[in-house]
Amino acid sequence: MKTKFIFITGGVLSSLGKGLAAASIGALLKARGLKVTIQKLDPYINVDPGTMNPFQHGEVYVTDDGAETDLDLGHYERYLGESLSQKNNYTSGSIYNRVITKERRGDYLGGTVQVIPHVTDEIKNAILGLAEDEPDVALIEIGGTVGDIEGLPFLEAIRQLRGDLGKDHCLYVHLTLVPYLKAAGEHKTKPTQHSVKELRSIGIQPDIILCRCEKAISAELKRKIALFCDVDQDAVFSSVDVDNIYEVPLRFYEEGFDQKIAIMLRLPAKNANLESWETLIHTCSHPEGQVTIGIVGKYVDLKEAYKSLHEALIHGGVANKVKVNLRYVNSEEITEANVAEKLAGCDGILVPGGFGHRGVEGKIRSIRHAREHKIPFFGICLGMQCAVIEYARNVLGLADANSEEFNELTDNKVIYLMTEWYDFRKGAVERRDASSDKGGTLRLGAYPCVVVPGTRAWDAYGAERVDERHRHRFEFNKAYFEAMAEKGLVFSGLSPDGELVEIVELPDHPWFLGCQFHPEFKSNPMRPHPLFREFIKAAKKEAMGGKKGK
């Protein structure tokens, strides 16, 4: 097998940044001319994160093939500039589901099904499946923290793989915390020592230790960690806190991280070309201005719920050479009386996707404020649906206009449940109703959109047909198409068969656009998404116009 595998584990505590570390390593190896892929293995029992509460899990990231995945896949795609798929994310739930399906089918010939070998073999199959596309390197991030009971089958599987594939084909990287105690004025290595001890008790000896820390650790401290953790001194690296997450690949490169990996895995000795990353950081560090974007949502207390959105707005800032300041506004707190105060100073207003009726009226009030005061507005998924509801109520005069999701009894369901649509990937019509399961039953993944010439959407894309990622079960009710068009709403993007509305906009507004899809999932720092580029461009014009007091 030509593929080399790098396994990334984490210790001491969660949220150390394994996903960013894996993505940054992948970016460095790709910059060396290698073909790279990345996989995330999540220990939770849910089959996928599709029905999980955003406050617990954060964003659900959607791939082209319709997989609902961990938000770390967003980091992977943004840093690699590659499209990933379902096989790049597995959970304990999906692994156990496969095992149980095989048992019910009789594949195990009546044998007793156990964690070892059946579950661990299924995990190994998922990992080795990455080699089918023949990448030079496959990075596998093990979710959770070493010592968690849920993660033990995954750790056992990657322990076995080194024996299966050989030492030249496997590398273990352990990310750990090295806290800095200000009172003592020094870093402490004991948490790292205990974390590695826990990992070794499972049978895994890390080859490289990556130390998450506030400031770079000294050579003396690296020697100490190397001694007690039984690794080479030049295999201990710092992962220092940075102001901009896109600096991480450059920091790793300065430490020689990619070179050490190349030596240990006997990869081609080619220097990394990081010119595009250096240009990116220079642009971020030297903005020509700044804009403030108000994000009106209900998950604002956990910024991870809007992770890709946050990054896509930053990308839009890079394209326009401005710093983007994000102000998160809780939609549940917005009233008719305070909407102007809540959104004062915003150069642009964005209403993101979401589910459920909570906070919807605050979003609709925000959209009306943006429309009437000519503030650039961008609505995504539910944000587009709310824009349609607002227009129906306040322009068409349909006071009870609503979505079937929020009010099943209204006479004017301008947004209603999708009951069928054509899935071009399957070549078949998908059908749903109100009794369908919630998990995995939305319109998911990349679908084509036909863009109407002469519109803002056309100006952004410069193309007649684009593919965008979706995650929704409600849609615009075409019974209101003509009435809204007569009142000035432009339908600038439709499905190829003309049945589904994908983009709406207002031509007599500085920039007012809503889309049913999630463009944030297809934006990366090197190629900002056209709609985010144009939205920030309009916000920049608003900021330069000095109209913040409106």
Curated annotation (Swiss-Prot):
Keyword Nucleotide-binding: yes
Spans annotated as Amidoligase domain: 1-267
EC numbers for this chain: 6.3.4.2
Residue stretches making up the Glutamine amidotransferase type-1 domain: 292-545
Residues the entry annotates as binding L-glutamine: G354, L382, G383, M384, Q385, E405, R473
An example Gene Ontology CC term for this record: cytosol
Residues binding Mg(2+): D72, E141
Keyword Ribonucleoprotein: no
Keywords carried by this UniProt record: ATP-binding, Glutamine amidotransferase, Ligase, Magnesium, Metal-binding, Nucleotide-binding, Pyrimidine biosynthesis
GO molecular function: ATP binding; CTP synthase activity; glutaminase activity; identical protein binding; metal ion binding
Miscellaneous: CTPSs have evolved a hybrid strategy for distinguishing between UTP and CTP. The overlapping regions of the product feedback inhibitory and substrate sites recognize a common feature in both compounds, the triphosphate moiety. To differentiate isosteric substrate and product pyrimidine rings, an additional pocket far from the expected kinase/ligase catalytic site, specifically recognizes the cytosine and ribose portions of the product inhibitor.
Name used for this protein in its record: CTP synthase
